[in-house]
């Protein structure tokens, strides 16, 4: 079982959060994969979180990811009035090869999807969406994918699955499982005219950064109807980013909210 490959959440992080007595926070709501207690019972979980640091096929320059920084800030937030169970299953270590990581992630996604559990993945690079997509191979319906990104990732000049070619690989996949693909937040000067022509030829929807900034409601029905939502942090606008234009934090929260309101048990990839 690939769940056994997951490493527990850092005890140092959990102890630090516990010492801060975060009353009413997500930290007190979530069941954690810990050294002593092991993996939580996923059969009673509605949402599972895993961390991934696989970026070897990113295409883009990637820094070493400290997923606990994101966890620390996330778990400080206050819980809502929901009746859902959340489990943090820990981190998936890199395999000996990228393909090993893909295979392990494929198995994890397939198991959780069979139990109708929403999976939130933090970390990794865009190419991990490919094994997530492949995990739908026995799913009766076709798959809708939404990518919140400043580029389309439709490069065709490589046989390797990477952060710039993964969507082209999905489109050409023999399974013919892709129903629809939508990009939200693309920036024209970062996308080749060939990619734009291909998006139009395949009747895939694209919403530019300017369009989504003016009217975020355009994205709501699309995201809520998605099976896979990928949110690439390079689409964000923040100090120090090599691309100063992008989605601001308020809009990022709105788009993430739409993903959380989906009834399709989606996979949400927060790609760093």
Show where each model-derived region lies.
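Conserved alpha-helical scaffold segments that buttress catalytic/binding sites
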Residues: 3-49, 56-270
């Amino acid at each position: 079982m690939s769940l056994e490959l997951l490493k527990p959440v850092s005890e140092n992080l959990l102890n630090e959060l516990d010492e801060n007595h975060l009353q009413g926070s997500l930290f007190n709501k979530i069941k954690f994969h810990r050294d002593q207690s092991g993996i939580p019972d996923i059969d009673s979980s509605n949402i599972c979180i895993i961390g991934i640091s696989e970026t070897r096929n990113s295409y883009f320059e990637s820094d070493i990811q400290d997923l606990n920084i994101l966890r620390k800030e996330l778990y400080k937030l206050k819980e809502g009035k929901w009746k859902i169970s959340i489990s943090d299953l820990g981190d998936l270590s890199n395999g000996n090869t990228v393909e090993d990581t893909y295979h392990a992630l494929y198995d994890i996604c397939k198991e959780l999807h069979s139990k109708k559990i929403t999976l939130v993945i933090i970390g990794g690079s865009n190419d991990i969406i490919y094994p997530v997509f492949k995990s739908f191979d026995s799913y009766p319906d076709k798959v809708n994918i939404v990518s919140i990104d400043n580029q389309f990732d439709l490069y065709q000049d490589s046989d390797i699955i990477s952060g710039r070619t993964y969507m082209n690989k999905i489109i050409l996949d023999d399974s013919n499982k892709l129903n629809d693909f939508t990009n939200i937040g693309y920036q024209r000067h970062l996308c080749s005219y060939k990619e734009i022509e291909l998006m139009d030829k395949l009747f895939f929807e694209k919403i530019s950064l300017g369009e989504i900034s003016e009217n975020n409601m355009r994205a709501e029905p699309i995201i809520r109807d998605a099976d896979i939502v990928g949110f690439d942090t390079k689409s964000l606008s923040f100090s120090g980013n090599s691309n100063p234009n992008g989605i601001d934090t308020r809009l990022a929260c709105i788009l993430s909210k739409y993903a959380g309101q989906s009834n399709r048990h989606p996979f949400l990839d927060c790609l760093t």
